[in-house]
UniProtKB/Swiss-Prot annotation:
Name of the protein in question: ATP synthase subunit a
TM ranges: 28-48, 88-108, 141-161, 206-226, 237-257
Designated gene of the protein: atpB
Quaternary structure annotation from Swiss-Prot or TrEMBL: F-type ATPases have 2 components, CF(1) - the catalytic core - and CF(0) - the membrane proton channel. CF(1) has five subunits: alpha(3), beta(3), gamma(1), delta(1), epsilon(1). CF(0) has three main subunits: a(1), b(2) and c(9-12). The alpha and beta chains form an alternating ring which encloses part of the gamma chain. CF(1) is attached to CF(0) by a central stalk formed by the gamma and epsilon chains, while a peripheral stalk is formed by the delta and b chains.
Keyword hit for Cell membrane: yes
Gene Ontology cellular component annotations, sorted alphabetically: plasma membrane; proton-transporting ATP synthase complex
Length: 266
C-alpha cells in the first residue's frame, strides 16, 4: 500500500505501524525487525573486520579514522565505568553501541522509501500491495529491545554468580538491605524487583524513544501535504540525530554499569 494509494491519514498511519509478520498472536514473528537487525549486525561486522584487516600505521583513511575514534571513545568509557577485569566488556560495549546506533539510524530514511519498494516487490510477486507491511527501524519494536535487554540480564546474572559464587549471589538477594533472616521474604522481593527492573527499563527506554521518533515522522508524512512536510521533517531529523546517538550511548553505558555492579564483591 503505497502512500498515494491510501485514502485517509488514519489508514496511512496504521499501515506504517504494522509489522511484516509470520504467525499469529503471541507466537507471531516480526520478520522485518529480525531481518534489519541481523542485516545491520552483519554490516557492522563486515565494516569493522575490513578496517581491521586493512589497518595501517601510516596515514589512515576516513573510514579507518572513524572506526578508530569510535573504538577509542568506547574503550575510554569502559575504562572509566568498569572496574573489574574482563576482556569481554569493551568488545561487548562496542558491539552494542554501533549495532544500536545503526538500527536507530534507519529512522532517518524517508518514511515511505523502503515500504514503497517492498510494496512494488510484493505486487510483482502477485500479492496485494495493500498488505505489504514493512517497518525498517528494529529498535522501534519492543521485541527487539527487550530481547537485547534480556541478553544483558543473562550476562549480569553470569557475572554476579562468577564473582560472588552461587552462595554469595543468593545471600545478596536474601540478606540485603535488611541483614536478618526474618526479613528474607522482604529482601527477596525488594532485590528481585530491583534486579528485574534493570533489563525491563533498559529495553523499554530504547523502545519508547525510538517508537516516538518513528511515530512523529509518520504523523508528519500522514497528516501534512507533501509540499510542507520538509518544514517539520528537516528540523526533527536534525534533532533526531542527537536522539539516536544518545540512545545508543545510554544503552551501552547502562549495560557496562550493570555489569560493573554485578562484578563487584560485597
Amino acid at each position: 500500500m503505497a502512500a498515494g494509494e491510501i485514502s485517509t491519514p488514519q489508514e496511512y498511519i496504521s499501515h506504517h505501524l504494522h509489522h511484516l509478520q509470520v504467525g499469529t498472536g503471541f507466537w507471531s514473528i516480526n520478520v522485518d525487525s529480525m531481518f534489519f537487525s541481523i542485516a545491520l549486525g552483519i554490516l557492522f561486522l563486515v565494516i569493522f573486520h575490513r578496517v581491521a584487516k586493512r589497518a595501517t600505521s601510516g596515514v589512515p583513511g576516513k573510514l579507518q579514522t572513524a572506526v578508530e575514534l569510535i573504538i577509542g571513545f568506547v574503550d575510554g568509557t569502559v575504562r572509566d565505568m568498569f572496574h573489574g577485569k574482563s576482556k569481554l566488556i569493551a568488545p561487548l560495549a562496542l558491539t552494542i553501541f554501533v549495532w544500536v546506533f545503526l538500527m536507530n539510524l534507519m529512522d532517518l530514511l524517508p518514511i515511505d522509501l523502503l515500504p514503497q519498494a517492498w510494496a512494488g516487490i510484493y505486487s510483482l510477486l502477485g500479492y496485494d500491495p495493500a498488505h505489504a507491511y514493512l517497518r525498517a527501524v528494529p529498535t522501534a519494536d519492543v521485541n527487539i529491545t527487550l530481547s537485547m535487554a534480556l541478553g544483558v540480564f543473562i550476562l549480569v546474572l553470569f557475572y554476579s554468580i562468577k564473582m560472588k559464587g552461587l552462595g554469595g549471589f543468593v545471600k545478596e538477594l536474601t540478606m540485603q538491605p535488611f541483614n536478618h533472616p526474618v526479613f528474607i521474604p522482604i529482601n527477596l522481593i525488594l532485590e528481585g524487583v530491583s534486579l528485574l527492573s534493570k533489563p525491563i527499563s533498559l529495553g523499554l527506554r530504547l523502545f519508547g524513544n525510538m517508537y516516538a521518533g518513528e511515530l512523529i515522522f509518520i504523523l508528519i508524512a500522514g497528516l501534512l501535504p507533501w509540499w510542507s512536510q520538509w518544514l517539520l521533517n528537516v528540523p526533527w531529523a536534525i534533532f533526531h540525530i542527537l536522539i539516536i546517538t544518545l540512545q545508543a550511548f545510554i544503552f551501552m553505558v547502562l549495560t557496562v554499569v550493570y555489569l560493573s555492579m554485578a562484578s563487584e564483591e560485597h
